[in-house]
Amino acid sequence: MKVFLIRHGQTDQNKRGILQGSVDTNLNETGRLQAKLLAQRLLPLDIDQIFCSSMKRCRETIAPYLELKPEVPIVYTDLIRERVYGDLEGMNVVEAKKLLNANHPDHYGEGLSHLTSRLLKFWDEYVVPLQGKKKCVIVLCHGGVINVLRTHFMEEKGFTFDKSKLESKIITFNTSITEIEVTEHGTGHIHTFGDASHLESEETGKLIA
């Protein structure tokens, strides 16, 4: 079974470098365009099931695809909402990282262990039962969520991956796709990290971001 972990489209806060966390923001104009390009990217796939964060920026990202394929079942869930960052929310990302580095990461908002438990609860309750039964599943969520799941799969569950793809820093672009293949026994292989090729402009070759 293939599982595509997809980040939401761009928001004004993303563009300005503001940490959103649990703040329920909308897509901006660029984000809405990214969502339409993502829909075209997903259209050829035979998608069995979609799981989507209940936050607006994720709902708005998957909406163009659902307009084209309304028959695909979707579940909106709080379990894959972005991490709660407490007092850091609304701050510049660079400044927020300085505070995180200066203090214990769990000092602000939702602790990493709690976040990981929440995400694994989602995986165990929603994704694991589909292993060996479905062929293609979409998980539309957040950058922080994808990073935690990816790290857990690589370091704790032993999912294999092409190490050459990790030679440079992984950037989880807006609407980028991380493709994972999971067997019915729970083993897996990560095929792509943050693939945003659908955002490449035909005129400039640069990402629409």
Curated annotation (Swiss-Prot):
What PROSITE patterns does its record include?
Answer: PG_MUTASE
Q: Cell inner membrane: present as a keyword of the record?
A: no
Can you name one GO molecular function term for this protein?
Answer: fructose-2,6-bisphosphate 2-phosphatase activity
The UniProt entry, under Gene3D superfamilies, shows: Phosphoglycerate mutase-like
> Under which EC number(s) is this enzyme classified?
3.1.3.-
Which GO cellular component does the record give, naming just one?
A: nucleus
Q: Where is this site: Transition state stabilizer?
A: 142
Q: List the active site.
A: 8 (tele-phosphohistidine intermediate), 82 (proton donor/acceptor)
Q: Which domain of life is it from?
A: Eukaryota
Places the protein is found: Cytoplasm; Nucleus
This protein's major location comes to cytoplasm
- Swiss-Prot/TrEMBL GO biological process terms: positive regulation of pentose-phosphate shunt
Keywords on record:
Cytoplasm, Hydrolase, Nucleus
Family from the record: Belongs to the phosphoglycerate mutase family. BPG-dependent PGAM subfamily.
Which PANTHER family does UniProt cross-reference here? FRUCTOSE-2,6-BISPHOSPHATASE TIGAR
The identity of this protein, by name, is: Probable phosphatase C1687.21
Which source organism?
Schizosaccharomyces pombe (strain 972 / ATCC 24843) (Fission yeast)
Q: What is the lineage of its organism?
A: Eukaryota, Fungi, Dikarya, Ascomycota, Taphrinomycotina
